[in-house]
């Protein structure tokens, strides 16, 4: 868990042919407490998603600082920021099973020697000579799957899942890494009303259970009022 702070954060996109430069964020000062669920609301184009992308390291700020757990991470690559992001589009790997999608971030973390890579590959493809590391990953995947009611779906591919199940897999992939911060960018937009309500309650329950600092972007006022500890309204940067 970690506190998050944006200090005089600005983001400007350079001019394109025939148009001027666009300043999307105009000196944001915002603090998110450790373990807090903060909801960002505002009209389309106001900079909500850009703020998350700056925190995740997917874009660089033009000016200002992004601080996580008291450390300025503005110049760090995404892999060193200890954040996990859930997108509106699920972003699942279609050729990987539910289990492998959940485990993907765990297997990608850190640098492994060739021998360890080969051993893990043998373990996944044959089921024997399972390395201690691969065993820990399998146990973590099972734990997360049970938490999200996905244990009976671990062998399925994304194309065999409903929209709600896909979103739970995306959540599982983020949870499995045990990050310091969760970032959620309109994760329920593609779901129908009933699934949206069910998944909304599940996200809130998981966040309270895990206690992970969470920034959640939505344009839905009902989501904002029912999910967050606090709401931050963003308008025109």
Across the structure, where does each feature detected by a protein language model lie?
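Helical segment within the ABC ATPase nucleotide-binding domain
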Residues: 197-210
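Conserved H-loop
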Residues: 211-217
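A short, surface-exposed alpha-helical micro-motif characterized by mixed small hydrophobic
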Residues: 224-226
């Amino acid at each position: 868990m970690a506190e998050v702070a944006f200090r005089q954060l600005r983001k400007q996109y350079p001019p394109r042919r025939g148009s001027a430069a666009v300043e999307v964020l105009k000196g944001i000062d915002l603090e998110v407490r450790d373990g807090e669920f903060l909801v960002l609301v505002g009209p389309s184009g106001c900079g909500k998603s850009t703020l998350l992308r700056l925190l995740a390291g997917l874009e660089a700020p033009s000016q200002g600082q992004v601080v996580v757990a008291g450390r300025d991470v503005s110049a760090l690559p995404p892999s060193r920021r200890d954040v996990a992001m859930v997108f509106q589009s699920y972003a699942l790997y279609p050729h990987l099973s539910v289990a492998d999608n959940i485990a993907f971030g765990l297997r990608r973390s850190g640098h492994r020697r060739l021998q360890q890579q080969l051993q893990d590959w043998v373990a996944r493809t044959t089921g024997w000579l399972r390395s201690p590391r691969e065993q820990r990953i399998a146990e973590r995947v099972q734990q997360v799957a049970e938490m999200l009611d996905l244990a009976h779906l671990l062998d399925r591919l994304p194309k065999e899942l409903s929209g709600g199940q896909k979103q739970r897999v995306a959540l599982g992939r983020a949870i499995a890494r045990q990050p310091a911060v969760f970032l959620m960018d309109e994760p329920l937009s593609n779901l129908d009303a009933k699934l949206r309500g069910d998944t909304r309650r599940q996200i809130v329950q998981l966040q309270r259970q895990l206690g992970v600092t969470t920034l959640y972007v939505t344009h839905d006022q009902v989501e904002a009022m029912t999910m967050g500890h606090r709401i931050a309204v963003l308008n025109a940067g």
